From Swiss-Prot:
Assembly mode: Composed of two chains; the small (or glutamine) chain promotes the hydrolysis of glutamine to ammonia, which is used by the large (or ammonia) chain to synthesize carbamoyl phosphate. Tetramer of heterodimers (alpha,beta)4.
Positions bound to Mg(2+) 4: 832, 834
Name of this chain's protein: Carbamoyl phosphate synthase large chain
Catalysis: reaction(s): hydrogencarbonate + L-glutamine + 2 ATP + H2O = carbamoyl phosphate + L-glutamate + 2 ADP + phosphate + 2 H(+)
Annotated pathway: Amino-acid biosynthesis; L-arginine biosynthesis; carbamoyl phosphate from bicarbonate: step 1/1; Pyrimidine metabolism; UMP biosynthesis via de novo pathway; (S)-dihydroorotate from bicarbonate: step 1/3
Species per Swiss-Prot/TrEMBL record: Bacillus thuringiensis subsp. konkukian (strain 97-27)
Cofactor: record remark: Binds 4 Mg(2+) or Mn(2+) ions per subunit.
GO BP: 'de novo' UMP biosynthetic process; glutamine metabolic process; L-arginine biosynthetic process
Domain of life of the source: Bacteria
PROSITE patterns, per database record: ATP_GRASP, CPSASE_1, CPSASE_2, MGS
Length: 1072
């Protein structure tokens, strides 16, 4: 059927900020969809609240709205733009829930707007646990014994009948939010209560646990003519019981017999047909390893995280084709963009193995509960491709950027068998490493299978790796063994350690013996047809398929997996850099390993290499391509960290030189440069021993800010108030020695300012200055940022501009730089300079219209700022106010403290823009998920050092009609100031206490600041966690609280009696 001509304008709903469970994969799918619809001649309007994405670039759609994804704002856009249809299935769970809400509110009917792709009835049938179960019964498809519950009593009834363990799955939620596995009554109460709170329809499905079955996924597509195909099937190495987003996944499935494969394939196609989905859909199934019994777990009637993985694993662009199907085209009419010969109705075939390993944030959150279950915890993932599973797995392991080059972790070597057994049974982020360690220590595959039901096939593959390790160690210098190890994916790093050589020596040894990998193409058809895609992976085989052209090329290093501190912002910069390289006439080559992102879409660059970002893997590509040089500025710390090793290999680093990069990162050199330029910075020194650290802190005076050098996202950074805290930090947070010094600075309590600039060595252009609402000490990525600055005097602004220009020139920056300043006692100090793209580049690029990554890339390639129409100076400020607000995923990570500090904790960001700061803040806060009611109760429990400051805040809450609740200490201070307050019991009280108020939803805000000294902090910690678990806004910074107050005050009309007004006026009578 040809495309529909009765619709012209389509509104695409984006997925909002990056949170655990919904990451960069929707930037990729949304971008593809918008481009796909524009290709077909439709007018595309996009609404999304996330400024860090390619999707929200003005070029992606005809009109882009960066507004909160709430009923209020999306309805307003629909009424204004009057689209003919909306396409919600590419915006993840957020997009689906929005479509349901819009339909129920009547706005779609009122404006005559149709839902494309997946009809509302299909969304509800797939997402509503009750309707889904009924449909499966009609189709005769087995689901685990289950019951829909709406309260705890119903849950008790089901468990009585079926017994433990049971799985709780809340309806209409994302990444298993609020769900889990219950083994006893205590867990049942906790998880069901949480699940009902998180489900927008207060409904959970309780099902008998089928943990231990194989978990299989099918990615399927269907069109309006009922053509349906399987794009890819995937198998989780972890059996059912671990969320698929937290599972290690391989594609295609490795352990299914043909009968099992066809049986599950037929089921998946039957389900997508019954739901009537037009587009992409993900079906999750459980298969009993010992019989042909299977169960349907769930269906996602939309493009998902798995579809992004399937797209990159096969080369088949699911989101692009789903958008075309949504407007009426059929699979047999759409040409496959990869082969450019076959049609989209051909099912892809793979002649390689793909592995996906999740990237968890536990390196950031030491206190987080690392156990994996049905609630997702990973922030991102890596993918790798190999000719065998061992190679594919080992490449994925070294892509994780945890400093791991092999399937082994030193700290696991001490584990005894009993501990290993416990951890393998329970499943955490290190399970595969523990399995390898257990095999090294002689535990049999049978025992391990008994503990965790991981398939023997996968255990055999791990055993193959362990056996190869023994071979390598026993045959030092043997070329045949080296060849076999390389074919299995062993890294030079591992072999060098085993053979007591340097990594460079192994590299040279291989080159002398012509032992280098070849590059194979990902072509969707296992080389059956000729293919046009330049999308490659490395392997040790015979024929090289990557043809080097005679064009001059430039390599851009991507930023690897999404994690806290290094998010989608860096992918945004990478993509813009690639486009600029192409505009400048060079061949653009990208190396990256993240399957979720736009940068790994093969249509972006001239050549895409899907490889780990390690020196060995990057050098293989450089040896083949011989580029003009490598750009490391846009890949975050990942790429910067490779610069020195690349230069040792004789590779040219384009842009800021290695020496100048080092000068910005090395503390002593940086201090010398600032002194020379006459730019003030907080007093600070470098310590290489614990004793030195104590002496420095004494000398400069507490509080001090301590951190290791060379970090991103403020890892292991802390504000320390006294010596015992400093000793605790030195012992637990860092391993200090001469190569890894610790920086100790005077901590200045002042306003933090952030600047992004572009320098060509002569000229320095400043697109924007941003002011942080939270004072210095809260990580810039967790602060609310405001542009243009609202409270900076012209004099201070001039100082900041002068310092930025001086730093750009003085540090010989060529490309981007990001500077953080603190304003203390009317003086500007430099806190740090990052000689690379920062996470604010997308935000400022969108606001100012200066395509920063593009301009910086052209500077790097030799076109100065003046030639590009910019010069030295500050870009004129915009009239509107823009707010960048952080978004956290605390609800997914139990036992993580929500207090803000110098260590970054947010996973994503949103933008609010309007004519006043209050309105922009309101939009930013609402978009970030904070509910802002205009009346209610506030609980105030603050540290002694904050009491004075909190009084003014409490008074303002009282004046706009809020009820104040406080524990005895804070209440006394309020009463002394004549501020009415209701005393509540502390949390250790047996009677009705503060936690009960939070649990019962009787408080709208909780203001709780951290008690220094870390121990009474346990009370504060419980208050903060209880707020998160119950969806109450918990404010740990008084600056953020003030910002919310500004919004509330702007929304509230004052109510004063006439007597109060006349009393105030009386003193103001002027006598003539």
């Amino acid at each position: 059927m040809p495309k529909r001509l009765d619709i012209n304008t389509i509104l695409v709903i984006g997925s909002g900020p990056i949170v655990i469970g919904q990451a960069a994969e929707f930037d990729y799918s949304g971008t593809q969809a918008c481009q796909s619809l524009k290709e077909e001649g439709y007018k595309v309007i996009l609404v999304n609240s996330n400024p860090a994405t390619i999707m929200t670039d003005t070029a992606t759609a005809d009109k882009v709205y960066i507004e909160p994804l709430t009923l209020e704002f999306v309805s307003r856009i629909i009424r204004k733009e009057r689209p003919d249809a909306i396409l919600p299935t590419l915006g993840g769970q957020t997009g689906l829930n929005m479509a349901v809400e819009l339909a129920k509110s009547g706005v779609l009917e009122e404006c005559g707007v149709e839902i494309l792709g997946t009809k509302l009835s299909a969304i509800e049938q797939a997402e509503d646990r009750d309707l889904f179960r009924t449909l499966m019964q009609e189709l005769n498809e087995p689901t685990p014994p289950s019951e829909i519950i709406h309260n705890l009593d119903e849950a008790y009834g089901f468990v009585k009948e079926i017994g433990y363990p049971v799985i709780v799955r809340p309806a209409f939620t994302l990444g298993g939010t609020g769900g889990g596995i219950c083994h006893n009554e205590e867990e049942l109460i906790e998880i069901v209560t949480s699940g009902l709170k998180h489900s927008p329809v207060t409904q959970c499905l309780l099902e008998k646990s089928i943990a231990g079955c194989k978990e299989i996924e099918y990615e399927v597509m269907r069109d309006s003519n009922d053509n349906a195909i399987v794009v890819c099937n995937m198998e989780n190495i972890d059996p059912v019981g671990v969320h698929t987003g937290d599972s290690i996944v391989v594609a295609p499935s490795q352990t299914l017999s043909d009968r099992e494969y066809q049986m599950l394939r037929n089921t998946s196609l039957r389900i997508i047909r019954a739901l009537g989905i037009e587009g992409g859909c993900n079906v999750q199934l459980a298969l009993d390893p010992y019989s042909f019994q299977y169960y349907v777990i769930e269906v996602n009637p939309r493009v998902s995280r798995s579809s992004a993985l399937a797209s990159k694993a096969t080369g088949y662009p699911i989101a692009k084709l789903a958008a075309k199907i949504a407007v009426g085209l059929t699979l047999d009419e759409i040409v496959n963009p990869v082969t450019q010969k076959t049609y989209a109705c051909f099912e892809p075939a793979l002649d390689y193995v793909v592995s996906k390993i999740p990237r968890w944030p536990f390196d950031k959150f030491e206190s987080a509960n690392r156990t994996l279950g049905t609630q997702m915890k990973a922030t991102g993932e890596v993918m790798s491709i190999g000719r065998n599973l061992e190679e594919s797995l080992l490449k994925a392991v070294r892509s994780l950027e945890l400093g791991i080059y092999h399937l082994e972790l030193d700290h696991l070597k001490e584990l005894d068998k009993e501990t290993m057994k416990k951890r393998i049974i329970k499943a955490d982020d290190e399970r595969l490493f523990i399995v390898a360690e257990a095999i090294r220590q002689g535990v049999t595959k049978e025992e391990i299978n008994e503990w965790c039901e991981m398939d023997f096939f996968f255990l055999q593959k791990v055993e193959n790796i362990v056996n190869m390790e023994r071979e390598v160690k026993a045959n030092v210098g043997n070329m045949e063994v080296l060849q076999t190890a390389k074919e299995m994916g062993f890294s030079d790093h591992y072999i060098a350690a085993a053979w007591n050589k340097t990594e460079r020596e192994i590299y040279d040894m291989r080159k002398e013996n012509n032992m280098t990998p070849v590059f194979k193409m990902v072509d969707t058809c296992a080389a059956e047809f000729e293919s046009a895609t330049p999308y490659y992976y490395s392997t040790y085989a015979d024929e090289n398929e990557s043809i080097v052209t005679d064009r001059k090329s430039v390599v851009v290093l991507g930023s690897g997996p999404i994690r806290i501190g290094q998010g989608v912002e860096f992918d945004y910069a990478t993509v813009h850099s690639v486009w600029a390289i192409k505009e400048a006439g060079y061949e653009a080559i990208i190396i990256n390993n993240n399957p979720e992102t736009v940068s790994t879409d093969f249509s972006i660059s001239d050549k895409l290499y899907f490889e780990p970002l390690t020196i060995e893997d990057v050098m293989h590509i450089i040896d083949l391509e011989k580029p003009e040089g490598v750009i490391v500025q846009f890949g975050g710390q990942t790429a910067i960290n490779l610069a020195a090793k690349l230069e040792e290999h004789g590779v040219k680093i384009l842009g800021t030189s290695l020496e100048d990069l080092d000068r910005a990162e090395d503390r002593d050199k940086f201090e010398a440069a600032l002194t020379k330029l006459g730019i003030p910075q907080p007093v600070g020194k470098t310590a290489t021993t614990v004793e030195q650290a104590v002496a420095i802190a004494e000398e400069i005076g507490y509080p001090v800010l301590v951190r290791p050098s060379y970090v991103l996202g403020g890892r292991a950074m802390e504000i320390v108030y006294r010596q015992e805290e400093l000793l605790h930090y030195m012992k637990n947070a860092v391993k200090v020695h001469a190569d890894h010094p610790v920086l100790i600075d005077r901590y200045m309590v002042g306003k933090e300012i952030e600047v992004d600039a572009i320098s060509d060595g002569e000229n320095v252009f400043i697109p924007g200055i941003m002011e942080h609402i939270e004072r210095a000490g809260v990580h810039s990525g967790d602060s609310i940022g405001v542009y243009p600055p609202q409270s900076l005097s012209e004099k201070l602004k001039e100082q900041i501009i002068e310092h930025t220009i001086a730093l750009g020139k003085g540090l010989n920056i060529v490309g981007l730089l990001n500077i953080q300043f603190v304003v203390f006692e009317d003086q500007v100090y430099v806190i740090e300079v990052n000689p690379r793209a920062s996470r604010t580049v997308p935000f400022l690029s969108k606001i100012t219209g200066v395509p920063m990554a593009n301009v910086a890339t052209k500077v790097i390639l030799g076109q100065d700022l003046v030639e590009q129409g910019y010069g030295t100076g500050y870009h004129p400020e915009e009239k509107e106010v823009y707010v960048k607000a952080p978004v956290f995923s605390f609800a997914k990570l139990r036992s993580v403290d929500t207090t803000l500090g110098p260590e970054m904790k947010s996973t994503g960001e949103v933008m609010g823009k309007d004519l006043t700061l209050e309105k922009a803040l309101y939009k930013g806060l609402v978009a970030s998920g904070i509910n802002i009611p205009t009346h209610g109760s506030v609980i105030i429990t603050v540290a002694d050092k904050d009491k004075e400051e909190a009084m003014e805040i409490a008074k303002r809450f009282h004046e706009i009609g809020y009820n104040l609740l406080a524990t005895a200490g804070t209440a006394q201070s309020l009463t002394e100031q004549n501020i009415p307050v209701q005393v509540v019991n502390k949390i250790d009280s047996e009677d009705y206490n503060l936690l009960d108020i939070i649990r019962q939803g009787k408080a709208q805000f909780v203001i709780n600041t951290l008690t220094k000294g870390k121990q009474p902090a346990r009370d504060g910690f419980r208050i903060r966690r209880e707020s998160v678990e119950n969806g109450v806004a918990c404010l740990t910074s008084l600056d953020t609280t003030r910002a919310i107050l500004r919004v509330l005050e702007s929304m509230t009309f004052s109510a004063h009696s006439m007597k109060e007004i006349t009393q105030t006026k009386r003193h103001e009578v002027v006598h003539a």
